[in-house]
Regions:
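Short glycine/proline-enriched loop/turn "hinge" motifs that connect secondary-structure elements
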Residues: 86-90, 129-134, 189
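Amphipathic alpha-helical interaction surfaces
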Residues: 60-63, 127, 167-171
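C-terminal edge-of-domain segments
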Residues: 177-225
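Short, hydrophobic/π-rich interface segment
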Residues: 145-187
């Protein structure tokens, strides 16, 4: 049976990833306990990469059983685990808040972001017409945990933002062509890691630049409907 074959093949990949994760976790510990923090760090990055790959595999595993509602149940679990906030600010700007820093560009990183952001956007706009911002600025605000100041020096060019822009474009942009939307990137300290994305009309961008310096630690209130 094709479904069973795909299911078991995917399960085998999950088991292989978990085995490699166990090996990397042991290596992370060994190098740390033996005073080689640099190599422990390198191994921890590899462990994180394997973990992301395992997550992508386990997310599709329930659907391969053929069970009715598997995708919806998986989306619900993702929503509970990664509660993405979507809405409009009081000024009428569209915003998305992701409770994590975006990963670096790597194999599987776009799929990982798509798996939680697209369902959140789809749910928010269900029964609502798309909102099209023209001549706007797409601002990415990377909020890092202030207890981890080394994250302030993130290389914005190496962060996986393209898939976020693509998903936002489906609902709030005519497209992401430079003539329609400019991009702006900044970092700020906060109580915990998160990523804030704002879609702002260009004539409002100077106002946003001023407000950005004093945004609340947990982010501004977001509304279901656009008031402006």
């Amino acid at each position: 049976m094709k479904t069973e074959t795909t299911y078991m093949k995917t399960l085998g990949k999950v088991e292989a990833k978990l085995s490699r994760m166990k090996e990397q976790a042991a290596a992370v510990r060994w190098f740390y306990e033996n005073g080689n923090l640099s190599e422990s760090y390198n191994r921890s990055l590899r462990l994180e990469e394997l973990s992301e790959q395992a997550v992508l595999l386990t997310r599709v595993l329930p659907a391969y059983t053929g069970a009715t509602g598997a995708t919806a149940q998986t989306d619900a679990i993702i929503s509970d685990t990664i509660p993405v906030e979507v809405g409009f600010t009081a000024e009428g700007w569209f915003s998305v808040r992701i409770p994590a820093l975006l990963p670096k560009k790597a194999s599987g990183s776009a799929d990982y972001i798509r798996s939680y952001l697209y369902p959140a956007m789809r749910k928010f706009f269900e029964g609502k017409p798309p909102v099209r911002f023209r001549d706007c600025v797409l601002a990415y605000r990377h909020v890092y945990d202030r207890s981890r100041p080394e994250r302030a020096m993130r290389d914005h060019d190496n962060i996986e933002t393209n898939i976020v822009t693509d998903i936002l474009a489906l609902y709030v942009l005519p497209d992401d062509h430079p003539a329609v939307c400019s991009h702006y990137y900044c970092s700020a300290a906060g109580s915990e890691d998160r990523t804030e994305v704002y879609v702002i009309p260009k004539h409002d961008f100077p106002m946003w630049m001023v407000e950005e310096k004093t945004l609340p630690d947990k982010g501004v209130k977001l509304y279901e409907v656009r008031f402006c």
